[in-house]
A protein has these predicted regions:
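C-terminal regulatory/interaction regions
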Residues: 280-321
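Active-site HxH/HxHxD metal-binding segment of metal-dependent hydrolases
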Residues: 33, 55-180
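Histidine-centered divalent metal-coordination motifs
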Residues: 80-86, 190, 252, 315
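Conserved beta-strand hairpin/beta-sheet module of binuclear metal-dependent hydrolase folds
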Residues: 5, 9-70, 196-208, 213
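Short hydrophobic/aromatic-enriched beta-strand-loop microsegments
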Residues: 98-104, 206-208, 304
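Short Gly/Pro-enriched turn/cap motifs at secondary-structure boundaries
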Residues: 10, 28-29, 165, 186-188
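Aromatic/hydrophobic pocket-lining residues that form the small-molecule binding cavity
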Residues: 60, 87, 229, 233, ...
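Metallo-beta-lactamase
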Residues: 46-50, 55-57, 118, 122-130, ...
């Protein structure tokens, strides 16, 4: 067995007692059928965790609607990594809910929030209008209404409300009292900050862009490192063989119910690509990404040329070239 060719597109839905998937309508050669945003709540709970809310706009509204239909408030937002197709909806979701954000690397998310009008006020991250002075007001009524952008009247009037961005804790953690227990597991390679979010109650792992059922991911050099990616595949295999994980929830495409064949297919793909690069170099191809793409990546969608170039750079670094 290897990668699985989907007979019908993945559409998301209520996939387990604790987990919903809202699949975004952003298909592309990079995002496949769309980004998976995940909602996680304990049975009977009134609050949930949202993982990877992106893109903004329609997807955020669908996440809010799904939570509303399930009778859930959003108590926390978590990112598996900080690529745009996994974090772009965070400002809009924070504006709508005031939920804290947890991420393995916070700088890009903080920049995104600031771009959308959030700022640090009074030593604590609060939502302020862009261009305002410290606790400047936003155009809204004093009774607590939101403006058209979803921002509160002012930081002062909404003390405690705002963009609270925190680094993911090490080890087991619950974002709030009735939340499911998670454990962040470092899975660098696709990006330096990539993590898997283990849900022990279901022996499931939210893998972001580390592993897909339908095909390989990209190692985004220089942030992504191939040696780290191989180590992350080993980590995934160990988690499965130890019985800690039985199911993967990826950032794109169907859940992975039989992980070991997909892990092995992914590892084989990476090794085969390395061997193809070495063969091309031995045959006289220049050690330049564009030349190697033309020699090795024949048949690849031209829209994937630039991501493939990033992976080729990662391969050359791995080979010490």
């Amino acid at each position: 067995m290897g990668f699985v060719e989907d007979e019908t597109p993945w559409c998301g839905g209520h996939v387990s007692a604790r987990v919903w998937c809202v699949r975004a309508n952003n298909p592309s050669p990079m995002t496949y059928v769309g980004t998976n945003s995940w909602i996680v709540a304990e049975p009977g709970a009134k609050e949930c965790v949202v993982i990877d809310p992106a893109p903004a706009g329609e997807q955020v509204q669908r996440i809010l609607a799904t939570c509303g239909e399930a009778g859930l408030r959003i108590g926390a937002i978590v990112a598996t990594h900080d690529h745009p197709d996994h974090i772009e909806g965070i400002p809009e979701l924070v504006a709508a809910t005031g939920a804290p954000v947890y991420a393995p690397r916070t700088s890009r998310i903080e920049q995104l929030l600031q771009k959308h009008g959030f700022a640090k006020c009074g030593g604590v991250k609060r939502a302020c209008s862009e261009g305002s002075e410290d606790l400047g007001a936003v155009e809204a009524g004093a009774a607590g209404e939101l403006d058209s952008g979803g921002l509160p009247h002012s930081c002062e009037e909404k003390a405690g409300w705002g963009a609270d961005v925190q680094a993911l804790p090490k080890g087991a953690f619950r974002p709030f009292e009735e939340a499911s227990e998670f454990e962040a597991i470092a899975l660098p390679g696709h990006s330096e900050d990539s993590v898997g979010l283990l849900l022990p109650a279901e022996q499931s792992l939210f893998t972001g862009d580390v592993l897909f059922r339908h095909g390989p991911t990209v190692v985004f050099h220089p942030d992504g490192v191939l040696a780290s990616y191989f180590a992350s595949l080993d980590t995934l295999e160990r988690l499965v063989r130890e019985g800690r994980v039985r199911r993967f929830y990826p950032g794109h495409g169907y859940p992975i119910n039989d992980p070991l064949p997909i892990i092995e297919a992914t590892r084989k793909h990476r090794v085969d690509r390395l061997n193809q690069v070495k063969e091309a170099l031995n045959a006289g191809t220049l050690a330049e990404p564009d030349a190697l793409f033309d020699a090795v990546y024949q048949g690849v969608n031209p829209a994937l040329r630039m991501p493939s170039i990033r992976s080729i750079r990662a391969q050359l670094k791995f080979l010490g070239i």
